[in-house]
Amino acid sequence: MKTRQNKYSIRKFSVGASSILIAALLFMGGGSAQAAEQQQDKGTVENSTTQSIGDENEKLSEQQSTQNKNVNEKSNVDSITENESLHNETPKNEDLIQQQKDSQNDNKSESVVEQNKENEAFVKKHSEEKPQQEQVELEKHASENNQTLHSKAAQSNEDVKTKPSQLDNTTAQQEDSQKENLSKQDTQSSKTTDLLRATGQNQSKDSQSTEEVNKEVKNDTQQVTAKNDDDKVETFNLNSKEEPLKVDKQANPTTDKDKSSKNDKGSHDGLANLESNAVATTNKQSKQQVSEKNEDQTNKSAKQKQYKNNDPIILVHGFNGFTDDINPSVLTHYWGGDKMNIRQDLEENGYEAYEASISAFGSNYDRAVELYYYIKGGRVDYGAAHAAKYGHERYGKTYEGVYKDWKPGQKIHLVGHSMGGQTIRQLEELLRHGNPEEVEYQKQHGGEISPLFQGGHDNMVSSITTLGTPHNGTHASDLLGNEAIVRQLAYDVGKMYGNKDSRVDFGLEHWGLKQKPNESYIQYVKRVQNSKLWKSKDSGLHDLTRDGATDLNRKTSLNPNIVYKTYTGESTHKTLAGKQKADLNMFLPFTITGNLIGKAKEKEWRENDGLVSVISSQHPFNQKYVEATDKNQKGVWQVTPTKHDWDHVDFVGQDSTDTKRTRDELQQFWHGLADDLVQSEQLTSTNK
């Protein structure tokens, strides 16, 4: 509704002292009148907002209530019926009627009424503080009779419709009474001159103090109202749960009710002025609590993650890799070392990522099965046929699952470092084609079979990325990995850390390399010594050899719907004899293997990163590859340029002594990798 222009006529008011109020209203600003009009429209909803104003107005109102409480009592009783018919004529008449009816309830004695009436008449006519006194009166009436306002307004509207003739009669009476009372005011003014001198100074100070407080409260109220106008729906919903009767919650329904008045600055300021002058009945901290609560809830909403990648990134560690909760104390954090936490940094920069926790020394097959259950959740089932073939237990640990809804159409990015690159290739092969041996075994022997071994689960992997992965094996494992001394070392380590009091988990419990609760240490050592693991090909030591890698290459294939990419490093230099020698900044434990690989008979295998030859890390020999460009491709290995002076652990930041490879460089590398994965989703998302 549009705000109506307020018009005043001396002929429209009743007899008695009501004319005194009319004279006072003429001194009041248009803003207060408009505020009263909107207050009438808003009803009890808007009146409730006055309860959140400060303690200062309450004290000032109590000081002045004894002087302004019962103004115009006698005349109000005589003219209340006529004034009701004028309720909807002008906003000023509405305020007058309400003041007349409200004051009727507070009439204590006729003598007090007469005295206060005389005092107030003189003050309204001659004092410069009349507007402030009238505002205080409005404050009191608004707080005491806000519940009866609507019912009286409805009654007055009905009277206007049914008795239009009362308007003319009342107008005539008001004109006569106005003339009579103007003369009466002159005679009464002399009686109150002395009283004014005694009280005028105090009233002036009180009014000035009231004005300053009202300005401050008004500004606070306008700020709260303006804030809720911008977020009216959201703020209302938040406050409705825990703050049922506060300023923020009241402002929004009112705004919805009268949208045009929100855009009217004059009306808005008038309403704020009325609220600021209302009697405060609660602690003024309530408004501050509402604001603080809204701010906290907004911040909580802003913290909700919107990841850049649609498909989660799964980081898969390599041989002798651990997560922090199960690693030996001598080892550093796998993904980032002392430089940074790669997964956490990706998360903080908008990429959803997880660190897989699988066997440190297990075979690619066993690790792939564990990786499936790490993502999907559930108890690891290595398969009945596989367990019978290699002589270990069928079931392993139970995973909670980081992506329980993982299924065809719900894809993931697999990123593997070192042996982890082989493991993720094995997993993707099982998803698509399953394990025919397990299917046949189940047909013959019955029982359950894992969905992983049944195959037919294509369209679950978006990309496969490998970092320093020995796709074709490594001379390090050929020459050292299967030597008796190396196996003995692995046996001793497993024996030491496999006791029941150790938190270290090598992921070989299904092989028996974990002390049982009721088993003595001597019994445990004998069992570990007799384990078939040390002679089995179902282990990481075998799969890292060139023969083991070749076997994996024959069993796996490229998926035409997956983006493949490899990253390779080297940290050796050529000698005069044509060999490759480890660089000075190579990770110290790898200098032995780096120099050993650098002396290989095959010249093309000599350049290496300390553990893996460059030629083995680029792509499987039997699978198609291209040089990587800015444009991603599916179904082919995309080989990125070799990173010089990068050894095997520089991709994961484990060498804290290498000053050439900085934290910023590592962070930049991973941000670029993650961004490339997001771009690859444009190619693979069409298959969802």
Swiss-Prot record:
GO CC aspect terms: extracellular region
Any one GO MF annotation of this record: metal ion binding
Region (Disordered), start-end ranges: 31-309
Gene3D superfamilies: alpha/beta hydrolase (3.40.50.1820)
Positions with a binding annotation for Ca(2+): 647, 650, 655, 658
Enzyme class: hydrolase
An annotated GO BP: lipid catabolic process
Top-level taxon: Bacteria
SUPFAM superfamilies with a match to the protein in the record: alpha/beta-Hydrolases (SSF53474)
Propiece residues: 36-302
Disulfide bonds: none
Protein known as: Lipase
Source organism: Staphylococcus epidermidis (strain ATCC 35984 / DSM 28319 / BCRC 17069 / CCUG 31568 / BM 3577 / RP62A)
